Amino acid sequence: MSLVTNIPYEQLTVGQFVVVERRVEERDVLLFAAVSGDNNPVHLDAEFAAGTLFKERIAHGMFTGALISAAIACNLPGPGTIYLGQHLDFAKPVKLGDTLSVRIQVLEKLPKNRVRLATEVFNQHGDQVVDGEAEVLAPRKEQTVEMPSMPTVTVS
């Protein structure tokens, strides 16, 4: 377990940002398909994917969206944040083996603890794969919480 301290609304500043990295693995794609029910063969079947414009299997777009959600919930503003909305543009496919940098930046502080965030994702080549914006309700007070350790989950 690890301790994480959120950043409450009053401490957020325009321009403040965080970058979280994650390598996309085979198991991520399989688990996301199993949990979401999105069994599109472009994600799961190499032979099928070879006949698409991508020429190979790709990760689910919303898997990348989930990484954005995790960065907001766990890093900026962090625990206690409530999602109000999200817009995503998928610029390029995410491939298995890609290392993604999820960048969350404070764009604007709005009334009633609402915050507008830039949500961008880049691959290991510096190519932007996702561009978006989120609106969240930031926590009112600073809290340090213990983040639970997650069990190892497998797909059989």
How does the language model describe each region?
Residues 1-14, 94-156:
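HotDog/MaoC-like acyl-thioester-processing domains
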Residues 2-81, 143-156:
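Hot-dog-fold acyl-thioester-processing enzymes
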Residues 19-23, 89, 105, 135-137:
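Generic structural detector for well-ordered beta-strands
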Residues 74-102:
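Mid-chain, well-packed structural core segment of small domains
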